[in-house]
């Protein structure tokens, strides 16, 4: 799974995804891409599940780029623990995805296979998405 090698701080604020993406809104590598419509927090496990679903559909042909990286540590308190006594331990890593952000890109496969792979990857993510083409 994706995780940063080094961090400046162990824990982070919860934060919100409010505005549209300022960067990463256009296709940079592939011919087809998966673009977010909503702003939401996507975990490293969800990104990995989407990657596996897409590569399995592509039968390991072509190339898949992941344009997002989980760099925000999300902390969680254990079950049945009373309020207070500090913030919980870091549990997993996530990325805050803004609306309009390209998350996956595909190149080197036929159009119908690329569209199917991106649909399968989209089903694994908690964000509403749409598929974009380079020539649109």
Swiss-Prot record:
Molecular functions per Gene Ontology: rRNA binding; structural constituent of ribosome; tRNA binding
GO cellular component, one term: cytosolic large ribosomal subunit
Keywords, alphabetical: Ribonucleoprotein, Ribosomal protein, RNA-binding, rRNA-binding, tRNA-binding
Domain of life: Bacteria
SUPFAM superfamilies attached to this UniProt entry: Ribosomal protein L16p/L10e
InterPro entries tied to this protein: Ribosomal_uL16, Ribosomal_uL16_bact-type, Ribosomal_uL16_CS, Ribosomal_uL16_dom, Ribosomal_uL16_sf
GO BP annotations, alphabetical order: translation
Annotated signal sequence range: none
UniProt keyword Ribonucleoprotein present: yes
Pfam families registered for this protein in UniProt: Ribosomal_L16 (PF00252)
Coiled coil, from the record: none
Protein task: Binds 23S rRNA and is also seen to make contacts with the A and possibly P site tRNAs.
Subunit structure of this chain's protein: Part of the 50S ribosomal subunit.
Entries under HAMAP family matching the protein: Ribosomal_uL16
UniProt record similarity statement: Belongs to the universal ribosomal protein uL16 family.
Name of this chain's protein: Large ribosomal subunit protein uL16
Organism field: Rickettsia typhi (strain ATCC VR-144 / Wilmington)
Gene that specifies this protein: rplP
């Amino acid at each position: 799974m994706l995780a940063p090698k080094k961090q400046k701080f162990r824990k982070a604020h919860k934060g919100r995804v409010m505005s549209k993406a300022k960067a990463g809104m256009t296709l940079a590598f592939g011919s087809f891409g998966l673009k977010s419509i909503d702003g939401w927090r996507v975990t490293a496990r969800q990104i990995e599940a989407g990657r596996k679903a897409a590569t399995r559909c592509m039968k390991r042909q072509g190339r898949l780029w992941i344009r997002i990286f989980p760099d925000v540590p999300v902390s969680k308190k254990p079950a049945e623990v009373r309020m207070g006594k500090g913030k919980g331990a870091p549990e997993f890593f996530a990325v805050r995805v803004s609306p309009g952000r390209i998350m996956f890109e595909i190149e080197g496969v036929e159009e119908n296979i690329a569209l199917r792979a991106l649909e399968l990857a989209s089903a694994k993510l908690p964000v509403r998405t749409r598929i974009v083409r380079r020539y649109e």
